[in-house]
């Protein structure tokens, strides 16, 4: 499959969420590409979300150098001179169209989503585009 990462690519088609994380298509697994995911440094996720009966939805992004061991996106928070590192999860608590920018420089990227609460009438589509900033 040939993918131009500079154009939005659907990595999760519209579907109801479950209460466990379900991974979308892993970016970087394609073969025969002229460019690789790690040749870009920005990932933009375009998320169309319908909350239905859910309390919220959660999205996590994981990175891998080898498509085997994945490491969840994290952020740092300073607290009284101590640097604390936390895994990062994006929580969506209302129906909407969301744009999530993510810095990256990894060979493989996996995006997963789940719902919290009752999944009835929920839906999520995720598109990804890569670029250089």
Regions found by a protein language model. Give the residues of each.
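Solvent-exposed serine/threonine-rich low-complexity stretches and specific carbohydrate-binding patches
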Residues: 73-90
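Short coil-to-beta strand junction motifs in C2/discoidin
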Residues: 54-59
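Noncatalytic modules at the cell exterior or secretory-pathway interfaces
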Residues: 41-47, 101-122
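Exposed low-complexity, polar/acidic, P/S/T/G-rich flexible segments that act as propeptides
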Residues: 121-133
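Surface-exposed loop/edge segments in extracytoplasmic proteins
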Residues: 6, 67-76
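Conserved Ser/Thr-centered positions that define the repeating blades of beta-propeller domains
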Residues: 62-64
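Solvent-exposed, flexible loop/coil segments flanking beta-strands in beta-rich domains
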Residues: 2-39
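Extracellular and analogous surface-interaction loops
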Residues: 29-41, 51-52, 100-104
């Amino acid at each position: 499959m040939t993918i131009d990462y500079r154009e939005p690519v659907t990595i999760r088609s519209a579907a109801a969420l479950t209460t466990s994380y379900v991974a979308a298509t892993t970016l970087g697994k394609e073969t025969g590409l002229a460019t690789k995911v790690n040749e870009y440094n920005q990932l933009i996720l375009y998320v169309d979300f319908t909350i239905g009966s859910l309390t919220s939805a959660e999205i996590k992004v994981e990175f891998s150098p080898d498509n085997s061991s994945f490491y969840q996106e994290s952020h740092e928070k300073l607290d009284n001179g101590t640097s604390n590192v936390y895994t990062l999860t994006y929580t969506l608590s209302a129906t909407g169209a969301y744009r999530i920018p993510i810095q990256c420089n990894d060979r493989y990227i996996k995006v997963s989503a789940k719902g919290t609460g009752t999944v009835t009438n929920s839906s999520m589509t995720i598109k990804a585009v890569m670029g250089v900033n």
